[in-house]
Amino acid sequence: MMDSVLEEDVTVPGTLSGCSGLVPSVPDDLDGINPNAGLGNGVLPNVSEETVSPTRARNMKDFENQITELKKENFNLKLRIYFLEERMQQEFHGPTEHIYKTNIELKVEVESLKRELQEREQLLIKASKAVESLAEAGGSEIQRVKEDARKKVQQVEDLLTKRILLLEKDVTAAQAELEKAFAGTETEKALRLRLESKLSEMKKMHEGDLAMALVLDEKDRLIEELKLSLKSKEALIQCLKEEKSQMASPDENVSSGELRGLCAAPREEKXRETEAAQMEHQKERNSFEERIQALEEDLREKEREIATEKKNSLKRDKAIQGLTMALKSKEKXVEELNSEIEKLXAAFAKAREALQKAQTQEFQGSEDYETALSGKEALSAALRSQNLTKSTENHRLRRSIKKITQELSDLQQERERLEKDLEEAHREKSKGDCTIRDLRNEVEKLRNEVNEREKAMENRYKSLLSESNKKLHNQEQVVKHLTESTNQKDVLLQKFNEKDLEVIQQNHYLMAAEDLELRSESLITEKCSSQQPPGSKTIFSKEKKQSSDYEELIQVLKKEQDIYTHLVKSLQESDSINNLQAELNNIFALRKQLEQDVLSYQNLRKTLEEQISXIRRREEESFSLYSDQTSYLSICLEENNRFQVEHFSQEELKKKVSDLIQLVKELYTDNQHLKKTIFDLSCMGFQGNGFPDRLASTEQTELLASKEDEDTIKIGEDDEINFLSDEHLQQSNEIMKDLSKGGCKNGYLRHTESKISDCDGAHAPGCLEEGAFINLLAPLFNEKATLLLESRPDLLKVVRELLLGQLFLTEQEVSGEHLDGKTEKTPKQKGELVHFVQTNSFSKPHDELKLSCEAQLVKAGEVPKVGLKDASVQTVATEGDLLRFKHEATREAWEEKPINTALSAEHRPENLHGVPGWQAALLSLPGVTNREAKKSRLPILIKPSRSLGNMYRLPATQEVVTQLQSQILELQGELKEFKTCNKQLHQKLILAEAVMEGRPTPDKTLLNAQPPVGAAYQDSPGEQKGIKTTSSVWRDKEMDSDQQTSYEIDSEICPPDDLASLPSCKENPEDVLSPTSVATYLSSKSQPSAKVSVMGTDQSESINTSNETEYLKQKIHDLETELEAYQNFIFQLQKHSQCSEAIITVLCGTEGAQDGLSKPKSGSDGEEMTFSSLHQVRYVKHVKILGPLAPEMIDSRVLENLKQQLEEQEYKLQKEQNLNMQLFSEIHNLQNKFRDLSPPRYDSLVQSQARELSLQRQQIKDGHGICVISRQHMNTMIKAFEELLQASDVDYCVAEGFQEQLNQCAELLEKLEKLFLNGKSVGVEMNTQIELMERIEEDNLTYQHLLPESPEPSASHALSDYETSEKSFFSQDQKQDNETEKTSVMVNNFSQDLLMEHIQEIRTLRKRLEESIKTNEKLRKQLERQGSEFDQGSTNIFASGSELHSSLTSEIHFLRKQNQALNAMLIKGSRDKQKENDKLRESLSRKTVSLEHLQREYASVKEENERLQKEGSEKERHNQQLIQEVRCSGQELSRVQEEVKLRQQLLSQNDKLLQSLRVELKAYEKLDEEHRRLREASGEGWKGQDPFRDLHSLLMEIQALRLQLERSIETSSTLQGRLEEQLARGAEKAQEGALTLAVQAVSIPEVPLQLDKHDGDKYPMESDNSFDLFDSSQAVTPKSVSETPPLSGNDTDSLSCDSGSSATSTPCVSRLVTGHHLWASKNGRHVLGLIEDYEALLKQISQGQRLLAEMDVQTQEAPSSTSQELGTKGPHPAPLSKFVSSVSTAKLTLEEAYRRLKLLWRVSLPEDGQCPLHCEQIGEMKAEVTKLHKKLFEQEKKLQNTMKLLQLSKRQEKVIFDQLVVTHKILRKARGNLELRPGGSHPGTCSPSRPGS
């Protein structure tokens, strides 16, 4: 067993030993923890040699101590085991069994002891835990008690200190008060002394005053005595006076003068004496009184002073008493506080004692516990020492080593963790640097983003500029294309003109005879027609111009509105400055144009007022001629005949008569051809798809109207009219084709211009004029029309020329009575008209028509005066009267009278054929002709030229007249026959038309009867469709550039194209029109075209009233229901199709113009047809005939007669005009009754009703087509909306709402389409849509003012106006819808207000419409009643006189209506402008919001930059702090190194001194030995010498060395103290460099004293050198410090210290601190130092050289060794001592030189004045800082630039807003000027004019 134990022991490593001595060797813990407590559990005890508390963490030293103790115990245990084994082997050499037994027993005991030990260890662990818990509890309680006691003591101390402070303050205050009080008492004492002295003086004075008072009393007594004497004397005087009076009473006879003289002398003497005495007394008295008063005042003042002094002294006494009381109270309080402080101090001492006692008790308890523990440990140690079990000890040691290794690993982990923390700190620092870099990168990114934004803005502006340039380029190309096409057309027209001139020259001679025949009849009619005023034509043309100016003004307003909408869009889309500038330019141009329009309007108004006043003066003169005017043709042809009269002789006129006979024959063939065409028309059954052009429909309806009107006359004359109308239709269709292909709107105008310039010449006007007409016709012929038209122009011209000749003959016979006053006015009127045309040409510079008129005026300036005026009138007439012949048949019907039927029948065809060129030209251009026809229906014929002043001077004979009259009568008879045939044919045509209109489902254009030329068009329907589509597309393109002209072309003649081309649009919409153009096409063209066709039919229907009122009412009701359904559809569109606003907003500008144009046209047509067609025709014809009479024919007598008649007629006219308004309704009813009496009227009414039915069906079809197209448009819009939703991020709810609304709109359109197809009544939907209808009614009523409100028109006419107003409202309603949608998208608040406004307007308009319908019905009933009361015979007589009144009243009424309509439109325009301004304001507000947002962003960026700057500055400060810390640490290190070096130097110095002392002692010993030898050798030889001299020198050297040693020790101690002080003050010196100078001043003077002390007298040269050095350094250091800033206090300290230490020959290093010596460098190639040090070094070197030379000499003089041996040894000691002294001095000089060298230091020369080490870092930092500053500066610059741009855009928006305000003001002025017009055109100043609009 022992072997096994030993073997186990062998396995233990050598570092471990036995554990037998482990437990006793471990000392006990203070807290009583048993070190064995953890051993039983395998835990290493926590106790090292030092007493370690269990809670404290152990460090490596504890573990090492423990390991060493364990090793020692292990070794001891091993030794004990070895000795015990040896002892056991010695004892037990016997049998081993006993040993085994004892061993087994011992093992058993050991096991039992182990168990006991474990139990005890567990008990000990429990006890130790209990003790620990108790100790912790007691310790925590003791700590808490201590803390409470400490807190209380602290509180008490604080309170006491506060009280003490307060008391000290109070004491100081009280002392101050006491001092003040003492000072006050002293001052009071002084004052009292003064007062007492003053009182004594006052008393003395008072005694003097008493004496004075006695004197005064005496004087007062004297004064009183004097007063008494005075009184007595006065009494005497009184007595004397009484005596005198008594004496005077008895002696009355004595003279009064004597008595007075006697009394006066004594009285004066007495009075003088008394006065003198009184004065003296008074003066004395006054002086005494003054002195008394002064004395009294002095007394009072002194008494007051004494009283105040007494009061002050009392106060002071009281204050002193109060202060003493306060002092006593304060002293008491101080004593109390002192007692409290003593008590508290005693309590504090007791508490301390208690604490100490508790601590001592605790320590005693712990000591007892420790003693118990030590006893237990001693027992356990004894047990262990007895048992000596190796295995358990080894296992425990192993466990403990494992624990130690674990703890070591834990410590290493902690160390690693700390290292990681350090690394993390470094990483955080690097992260901070990274964040700085990131911030810099972000700044750079921001700058790049700003640059990118600027580049994007620049690219955007460039793209916008390029787009605008492209648009301009495209427009220029379009303009070039148009000009090229116009040039081509000009070339073609010139060719045709040449051909026409040839044809005219061939046919010219055939027409002379017929002109002679027609001249007689024209002369007959001339007698009657010469009384018409000449100015009416110009008036009418001026009225047309005025109305056209109204239209232009409206168009300008609409254009400006479009520009405003475009401006709003551009503001919303982009902030481009170029767009804004362009919009500004547009606004300026509009403003200028508007100002010009206003000026032209004012001039126009002036001229109109003058013309109206002139016409008013002439109107009365023409009344007498109305009964004589019989023939319409005689009026129409007189002017034109004048042109040819001056060029033809009588033979030529006879030839023209024969030509006229030939013409009648040809007319017969034409009549036959017309029969054939009517038969073909009726046989065809109208199987075609509809006529391709609505031009035919408009012409045909007017043709039918003319035929109906002619049925009332008993003669047949319609064959020529129909033929002429057919010609017109064919020609107009051809010119329409030509226009649509060429794209030229004003081709016709060029022809008129050339014609007028030719006609103005005087060479051959007839031929040129005819050539111009033929030239107009020539390019318009197609292949199938040429056969019909080849013979017609020549024949028609022959007829016209014959009639002109007859007119000339008749005019020669006309009396000149009525000519003078009328021709006199023509030049003035013509001149005014010229001015009017010029102003209008300026008012619309883009209108080519006006420009052509202006060009004609310029050309006409070359001809004579009359020609100029004629040409000016003519150019205006070209615009105003182009379609007169189209409606002449209608006028003829009203002009026919039973008296002159034969003559009129004979002349009518000739008239119609007399101007074929004009008719063809007028109908050839659809836009101009139909527009002007709509403008004015007055049949004013255009004159070829009026420069014909000599044409009336040709001779004429009576024979020619009679011949011509007979021939004319024959021709009239033939014409009667032809007209009867024509009437029959006409009736057949009406029946065919009725059959056509009666079809159940008529085609779209069935209502337009096909003319005779229609067959030609049926052959090529595809070509016509192509023409029409191209024309419609061309119109869409031209709509923006020239709205007025293109609109008039579209809406009056061309709109039939639009619906006709709809099928092609449906089939192939991409080829023809885009969706936008389809919408534009629908809204702007289709509805007005329908309206125009309605107007064409209603012109005839308005006259044909009958008693079928119930039927008409039913029709009106049906139409209203259909219209309401249509309005519901419109409202649904208005409500739901918000997405279509972008497509429909394009139409806003044109629709208003269309509405404004269309409605006055409808009103004018109706009124003109109703009132003034017949009368105005004749009236105007007379004006035109009489206008151009030459002024040479005016007679002075006739002029006087005319003046008288004018005055009379003006008076009568004034009276009649006052009665006009009263007679208005009666005249109209009578006139309608006259028309209704003829039987064919009722047939025509039936036909008109059938026509209305067909028209309604057509309208339903049109509505169906519109619904189909709008539904398709809605489908495309829904698809586009879905794509937009996919493309953009839109709110889902909003998108869903929009999609639902669009779907509802599409469903409504489908329902409406089905209703149009099925024809069901819409009344079912009315209940659910009453609210919608109210809104539509209000919208209708907004345009009620444009409807004719006059009570004259019949119900059918009112109905047609109602329909047209509804259709025009559709476009206007779309406009309003678009505007409301726009505003609802932009500003949602506007939608509600607009909705309410629309509802109110619709309601009011609906009410007014119903009232107008009721008044129309009442008027119809009145017409029917009054029609039965008059017979036919009186109608014709009465009508001639009544129609003037009716025309006047109708014109007045119409002008009023027109003014109201224009005012309303202006109000609406201003309202629209206000809305646009509001939108602009909103856009401005949005811009300001965006500006503020940008400013906020700018502020945030600025704050970010400031924050970055602050962070950068903070980082810089942090870096500087770190640099300073590094410097400080470097300085500290250098100081420590220098201290170590100094100590080493001191040690080396001491060693050297010791060595030198030892050498000297050895030398001394050798000398002693030599002396002894010498003494021994020769006892007498040394006596003669002085051996003590050498000893004395050695002793002196030793003493000097000792002194030097002592002084070096002193200097080392002082240096050590100074080094410690410097180390203590090192941080302060690093921060405060100012102290270094003081240290320098202190440190430098110390060393010379030390040098003086320890150098002594032995080395005077050394001391002198050192003094020189330090004196020079003293003198120079301040200068060097001031001159060279790198030298600091530390350096000077190092110099002084080194110089101090160098006195002891210590090598010194100059201390150079970084940061102060910027030039110092270890690797420097230069040396820097003071010049004094350098000079001292040179001195030392020279001294050393001298010493070495002396030593060299001594060594040479020394005797050789042989001489020494020989015995010559006497003189040796002296040279040896000198050599030793020279060696020592050489050493000292070398050391001093070394020290001087150490004072210099190595430097590197400065590079550009900067330190290469430190300044590079500073330079880098500065460079980074400057970079950051530059970046910030650039960013601020960019932000400022953006701010400037924003401010500039804001200013531009302000400028735009100001311009808009200015334009708004101008519009207001224009509206005011327009509102002035109704006041000027009151009934008394109006004329029967017909302005067209």
Curated annotation (Swiss-Prot):
**Skewed-composition ranges (Basic and acidic residues):** 1469-1486, 1500-1519
Q: Which UniProt keywords apply?
A: Calmodulin-binding, Cytoplasm, Cytoskeleton, Golgi apparatus, Microtubule, Phosphoprotein
Q: How is it modified after translation?
A: Phosphorylated in vitro by CDK5.
Coiled-coil spans are none
Q: Where is this region: Interaction with MAPRE1?
A: 926-1208
**One GO BP annotation of this record:** chromosome segregation
Name any one GO molecular function. calmodulin binding
Specify where the region named Interaction with PCNT and AKAP9 lies, as residue ranges: 1196-1893
* Location of this chain's protein in the cell: Cytoplasm, Cytoskeleton, Microtubule organizing center, Centrosome; Golgi apparatus; Cytoplasm; Cytoplasm, Cytoskeleton
Pfam families noted in UniProt: CC_CDK5RAP2 (PF23246), Cnn_1N (PF07989)
User: Looking at the record, which segments are called Interaction with NCKAP5L?
Assistant: 58-196
Question: TM spans, by residue?
Answer: none
Where does the record place the region Interaction with CDK5R1?
1726-1768
Q: Where is this region: Disordered?
A: 1015-1071, 1347-1381, 1467-1486, 1500-1521, 1675-1706, 1752-1774, 1874-1893
- Biased amino acid composition, Polar residues: 1753-1766, 1884-1893
Q: Where is this region: CM1 motif?
A: 51-94
Domain of life, source organism: Eukaryota
Q: Which residues carry this modification: Phosphoserine?
A: 547, 1238, 1490, 1663, 1666, 1893
Instruction: For the region Required for centrosomal attachment, Golgi localization and CALM1 interaction, give the residue spans.
Output: 1861-1870
Q: What is the protein's known function?
A: Potential regulator of CDK5 activity via its interaction with CDK5R1. Negative regulator of centriole disengagement (licensing) which maintains centriole engagement and cohesion. Involved in regulation of mitotic spindle orientation. Plays a role in the spindle checkpoint activation by acting as a transcriptional regulator of both BUBR1 and MAD2 promoter. Together with EB1/MAPRE1, may promote microtubule polymerization, bundle formation, growth and dynamics at the plus ends. Regulates centrosomal maturation by recruitment of the gamma-tubulin ring complex (gTuRC) onto centrosomes.
Can you state the subunit structure given in the record?
Answer: Homodimer. Interacts with CDK5R1 (p35 form). CDK5RAP1, CDK5RAP2 and CDK5RAP3 show competitive binding to CDK5R1. May form a complex with CDK5R1 and CDK5. Interacts with pericentrin/PCNT; the interaction is leading to centrosomal and Golgi localization of CDK5RAP2 and PCNT. Interacts with AKAP9; the interaction targets CDK5RAP2 and AKAP9 to Golgi apparatus. Interacts with MAPRE1; the interaction is direct and targets CDK5RAP2 and EB1/MAPRE1 to microtubule plus ends. Interacts with TUBG1; the interaction is leading to the centrosomal localization of CDK5RAP2 and TUBG1. Interacts with TUBGCP3.
Protein name per the record: CDK5 regulatory subunit-associated protein 2
- Could you read off the lineage of the organism from its UniProt record? Eukaryota, Metazoa, Chordata, Craniata, Vertebrata
